[in-house]
Each structure stands twice: as structure tokens, then as C-alpha cells.
Design a protein with these regions (language model features):
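CN hydrolase (nitrilase-like) catalytic-core segments centered on the catalytic cysteine
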Residues: 1-70
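ATP/NTP-dependent adenylation/nucleotidyl-transfer catalytic domains that generate, transfer
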Residues: 31, 57, 83-128, 132-322
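Residues in well-ordered beta-strands of folded domains
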Residues: 35, 76, 283
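Hydrophobic residues at beta-strand termini and immediately following loops
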Residues: 37, 65, 75, 180, ...
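A short, polar/charged loop-to-alpha-helix boundary motif
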Residues: 68-87
Length: 322
């Protein structure tokens, strides 16, 4: 007897090993061959990675399809217990490096979402920081540089280094980019609000106005050219509310929404090993939103090396805060 398991199991960085262990156990318990067939493709925020597998009745895996690739594969099964696999097994396609598998999942998700929703391309707000740099790389690897546009939107608080790094990244990736200063609309908002604010000291209100001005510019390009805005926020920031509603959260798809900040750095370094496109300044400098003078993320948050493990325990492992 052969058991066919037709599945639509979404991707998770640890799920493939969980699947293998569970299917192997069930196959050996039932003394039955198991053919596990999984969906490939993206559907909104979900990514289905494929990784279809065949296990013999001893619980040994005798075939696994490549990740994130549709295909028709063959494997011969001797129901007496002797497996005869064809060359289509392709074990070399299995990824031993976690960063490679996760990066490929992110690229696959962007590609499927954009194509299935018939967008003409995507637009990314490029700040000179690590999150937008990685998002731009993912977009280009998914869609090609001709279908990606970068928008650099400096303010009075944006350092020359940030603008230079953003331009260097865009030029290395051969992507079209435009520079639009937000100083004029930001100043106009401050002037309009001056009678209401009555000389109250500047705080996060003015910081959020800058982020929202950038969101308006990105959405204007999206509407005019039918391009999807890719939000660039990561899971660490979203989990603690270190983001601006209708500002940097604006976008139709967020590739890094389930990626911790520390993992963002790991993925950026991995991508640079393939081709060094992200300037070292972007990877090495302390993270900053640059919404006020001398601002650093660590002024408001613990270092991400400390914060991320805490958030992971609380959010993903459901541990009690105490």
C-alpha cells in the first residue's frame, strides 16, 4: 500500500525537518510508503515551498523535490522494500544553509505576489539603511532590475553618507532611482500646524510626519504607474511598534514582515557573498531612522542582539513574559 498525502503546507524556516520527522515516523509505524506532495507558490502573505517527499515503509526518505520549484518528478518504488530512484532525486538542490533557503523564500514570495496581481513592477523607498537595502535586493532578484524602481527621499536629518550609500546600492544593482527631497512638503506641514501646535517642543509627531510624507510619495508613484510599493519594515520593529502608521508601514507587500532584524543582517551578508552589492557602510553602521539629529535605534530599543531572542521566545514560542 502507498499513502498519498496531498498538502498545502506553508513555508517556515524549521518546518522541513519537522515534516521529515513526522512523515518518517508515520511511514515506519504503518509500514507503508508515503508520498507527500506539497503546493508550490505564493498566496498573499503565505509562501508554499514544495519540498515534496517520498518515504519507504522503513521511514527512510528516498526522494525530495527542490525547494520553491514546480515540476513533474518520477521515482520508482519497489513495494517489497527496495527503492529504485531515478536521477531526478536531485539531492544537491537541498539547501544546507539556512540563509539561502530563507532568502529564496522571500524572493519567491515577492515574485508570485507581484505577478499574480498583475502589477507592472515595484517601487522601494531607499533610505541608505539595511532593511531597504535588503528589500531592494530581494525585489531585483525576484523581478529583475527593469521592473524595480528605487526612490531616495532625504530630509534635513538625512546624512550625506545615507544618500551616498543608497545611490551606490542602486547603481551597483543597475536599478532606476530618483531622488526627491521631502523638505518642502515637511516644512509645509510644520507651517500649517504651527498655529495648532503653539510652539510645543518637537517630538515623535514631527518624526512621524516625515515618514508619512515619504509614504505619500511612494503611493503616488504606485497609483500613477501601477507599481506595488514594497514596505521595508522588519519583524523586530513591527513587534514593538517602532514604526509609523501610514508612513514606513505604507505598502502593498512587506517582504521582511516575518524577518527579525538580526536575521536581516545575516541575509544581507549572505547576499553579499553571492555578489557584493550592499555597501559595507550600510551593514556596519548602527541602525538609525534619521528622523531627528543624532538618532539611533538603540536610543529607543535594546540592541537587536538582545531584543530579538526575547521577542522570539514571547511571540514564536509563546513563553510567558516573566
Amino acid at each position: 500500500k502507498i499513502l498519498f498525502n496531498i498538502n498545502a503546507s506553508p513555508y517556515d524556516k524549521n518546518k522541513n525537518n519537522e515534516r521529515k520527522n513526522l512523515i518518517s515516523k508515520r511511514a515506519s509505524e504503518a509500514s507503508m510508503h508515503v508520498v507527500y506532495v506539497n503546493l508550490v507558490g505564493g498566496q498573499d502573505e503565505l509562501i508554499f515551498d514544495g519540498n515534496s517527499m517520498i518515504f519507504d515503509k522503513k521511514g527512510e526518505m528516498i526522494f525530495q523535490s527542490p525547494e520553491f520549484e514546480e515540476g513533474l518528478y518520477e521515482a520508482q518504488i519497489n513495494i517489497e522494500g527496495i527503492e529504485n530512484k531515478k536521477e531526478l532525486k536531485k539531492e544537491n538542490d537541498l539547501y544546507s544553509i539556512e540563509e539561502e533557503s530563507i532568502y529564496k523564500a522571500l524572493v519567491f514570495g515577492v515574485k508570485d505576489y507581484v505577478e499574480k496581481n498583475n502589477f507592472k513592477g515595484v517601487v522601494v523607498g531607499l533610505s541608505g539603511g539595511i532593511d531597504s537595502a535588503l528589500t531592494l535586493c530581494i525585489a531585483i532578484d525576484a523581478l529583475g532590475s527593469k521592473n524595480v524602481e528605487a526612490l531616495i527621499m532625504p530630509s534635513r536629518y538625512t546624512s550625506k553618507m545615507s544618500t551616498d550609500d543608497a545611490r551606490a546600492l542602486a547603481e551597483k544593482l543597475k536599478v532606476e532611482y530618483k531622488i526627491i527631497s521631502i523638505e518642502a512638503p515637511f516644512s509645509a506641514f510644520l507651517q500649517s500646524l504651527e498655529p495648532v501646535f503653539k510652539k510645543l517642543p518637537m517630538d515623535t509627531t514631527e518624526e512621524n510626519i516625515q515618514a508619512r510624507v515619504r509614504g505619500v510619495l511612494l503611493m503616488a508613484i504606485s497609483n500613477k504607474y501601477n507599481k506595488l510599493v514594497l514596505a521595508t519594515g522588519n519583524k523586530s520593529e513591527m513587534s514593538v511598534g517602532y514604526a509609523t502608521l501610514y508612513g514606513d508601514m505604507a505598502g502593498g507587500y512587506s517582504p521582511l514582515k516575518d524577518v527579525w532584524k538580526t536575521l536581516v543582517y545575516r541575509l544581507a551578508k549572505w547576499r553579499n557573498k553571492e555578489q557584493e552589492v550592499i555597501p559595507e557602510n550600510i551593514i556596519d553602521r548602527p541602525p538609525t531612522a534619521e528622523l531627528r539629529d543624532n538618532q539611533l535605534d538603540r536610543d529607543s530599543l535594546p540592541d537587536y542582539e538582545i531584543l530579538d531572542p526575547i521577542l522570539e521566545q514571547y511571540i514564536e514560542l509563546d513563553h510567558h513574559p516573566e
